[in-house]
Every structure is written in structure tokens, then in C-alpha cells.
């Protein structure tokens, strides 16, 4: 397999993990807050087939921005519909950030203590791409424009008249945002935000670096 083919294979596998985690996060939050609509539709699952959208997944793999089937919610089932929708929306990016943190922990453990083999190099590359994609999904979805998760979070703080006035143009706004992303117009701001989140995750797993350095210097002392 060529290097480019391997790259896209790993990105495909990463997408099949990151996207279901995001959507299952929405479904879990909705269920915990009193709405079982997504659970009844089978969306409380990490099975990629439950969330799979062919075009959205292909766009994620090849263009870096994509989508899955939207998770259905019924605001009437929430005790507080406004905050129920906002917290359910927030749960998707939070799920991605949690997965990114766990992937970075695993990646560092592999980097410091696993023997260097062809297999461990592939796993390390998978974990690294998983962190990148999860961070990218979280950051992109928090953009406060419809129909991204950030717009649902705005519902909790904006007057309903303004919010629903904006939502009338949801499809047009989405096309503009996707065109801006694919055209590279948002590369700068998104890169800055992605790097910021990556650095925070790196800082949050710094204890692994310290343990690795301490172990290394202790082994030097034992040899001496």
C-alpha cells in the first residue's frame, strides 16, 4: 500500500471512531436529561452504521470537515427545553474532547514505553490522527452558526425571537460556512483554536511525560 493510501485508510478508521463518539454523546446527554428519542432510534451506540452518512464521512476523510446523521431530540421531554437542547448539543464536542484526551494518553504511553515496531508505529499514527480529528470536530462544531452544535448552545442565551430568526437561514448559512472551510478561508482561525486545544491536552497529560523522564533518569542511575 502506498503512503497516501495508508494515510487515507487510517483517516477512514479514525472517522469511524470519532464521528460515532460525537453522535453517541448527543444521544447519551439527551437520554440522561429525559429525552429517549435518540435511544429508541438506536443512536445511543458507538456502532458507526447507526450514525453513518456516506457523503459526510467521505468529506471528513478527504476534506477534513464532514457530518453524520443528525441525532433526533424532542425538546418537550426536557424539564427545561432551552437548556436541555443546549446541553445535548454541548455533549457532542465534549465527547470528542474526552476521546481526544484518552487517545493522547494512549499515544504518550505508546511513545515512551512500547517497543518500536511496524505495528506500534501504525497504532501511534492512528492515535495521533484520532486526537487531531476529535479536536477538529469539537472546535468546528462549537462555531455558533446553524446547524452546528454551537448554534444550539446559543439558544440558551439568545432571545428566542432572534434565535429562530437566524435559524430560518440555517441551510444557507451552512453552505457559506462549508464553502469558507473548503476554500481555506477559515484555516487560520481554526488552526489557532485547534493548536490551543492540542496544547491544553498536552498540558493535561504532562504527568505522563514527567513519569517517563523520571523512569529514564532512574534507569540511568541504576546503570551507573
What is the predicted role of each segment?
Residues 1-224:
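Hydrophobic transmembrane alpha-helices and their immediate loop junctions
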Amino acid at each position: 500500500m502506498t503512503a497516501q493510501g495508508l494515510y487515507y485508510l487510517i483517516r477512514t478508521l479514525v472517522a469511524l471512531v470519532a464521528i460515532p463518539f460525537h453522535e453517541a454523546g448527543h444521544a447519551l446527554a439527551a437520554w440522561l436529561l429525559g429525552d429517549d428519542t435518540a435511544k429508541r432510534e438506536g443512536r445511543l451506540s458507538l456502532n458507526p452504521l447507526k450514525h453513518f452518512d456516506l457523503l459526510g464521512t467521505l468529506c471528513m476523510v478527504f476534506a477534513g470537515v464532514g457530518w453524520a446523521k443528525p441525532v433526533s431530540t424532542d425538546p418537550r421531554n426536557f424539564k427545561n427545553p432551552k437548556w436541555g437542547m443546549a446541553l445535548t448539543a454541548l455533549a457532542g464536542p465534549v465527547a470528542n474532547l474526552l476521546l481526544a484526551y484518552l487517545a493522547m494518553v494512549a499515544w504518550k504511553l505508546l511513545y515512551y514505553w512500547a517497543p518500536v515496531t511496524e505495528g506500534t508505529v501504525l497504532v501511534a499514527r492512528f492515535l495521533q490522527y484520532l486526537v487531531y480529528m476529535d479536536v477538529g470536530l469539537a472546535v468546528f462544531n462549537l462555531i455558533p452558526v446553524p446547524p452546528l452544535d454551537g448554534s444550539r448552545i446559543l439558544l440558551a442565551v439568545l432571545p428566542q425571537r432572534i434565535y429562530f430568526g437566524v435559524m430560518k437561514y440555517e441551510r444557507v448559512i451552512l453552505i457559506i460556512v462549508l464553502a469558507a472551510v473548503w476554500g481555506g478561508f477559515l484555516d487560520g482561525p481554526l488552526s489557532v483554536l485547534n493548536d490551543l486545544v492540542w496544547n491544553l491536552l498536552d498540558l493535561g497529560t504532562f504527568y505522563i511525560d514527567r513519569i517517563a523522564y523520571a523512569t529514564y533518569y532512574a534507569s540511568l542511575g541504576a546503570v551507573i
